[in-house]
């Protein structure tokens, strides 16, 4: 099944682009050493957007909620799908949702990346992994903040 982490061909994950008045939350991936948005694999019975919200809450310690439009069935707008090759020959699909992180300082629990903070839009764009940078440029422009490149 595509949502199964052990599936051979396709891994699907859900992640949250966490934004607020302070900018964007980025964290340093513990294994890869790159700066990304919170996210992870989808648990059994979970939707990709449920996973994005749960992972955002777990990895940041923030009270989070969907920031983009949510339809009558409670399904939030899908902001971006990132497609890239995974480490073991599989295709990785990351479904990204816009999440409101409020204004508090991140407080990640033990076991999650401790390298996490709010970055203003320009700093986030500079620091983010290339796969995230493009959507941050678009979001920054549509939110009336950050650069217009």
Where are these regions (language model features)?
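Unchanged
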Residues: 43-134
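Acidic, metal-coordinating catalytic segment for phosphate/diphosphate chemistry
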Residues: 1-15
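Charged phosphate-binding loop/patch that engages nucleotide di/tri-phosphates or the phosphate backbone
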Residues: 127-149
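Short histidine-centered beta-strand/loop micro-motifs
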Residues: 6-7, 27, 40, 107-110
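Residue-level signal for pocket-adjacent positions within structured domains
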Residues: 7, 30, 37, 76-78
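A cytosolic small-molecule/anion-sensing beta-strand core signal
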Residues: 20-21
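Anionic group-transfer/hydrolysis microenvironments
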Residues: 17, 30-31, 96, 122
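Glycine-rich active-site/cofactor-binding loop and its immediate structural neighborhood
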Residues: 24-54
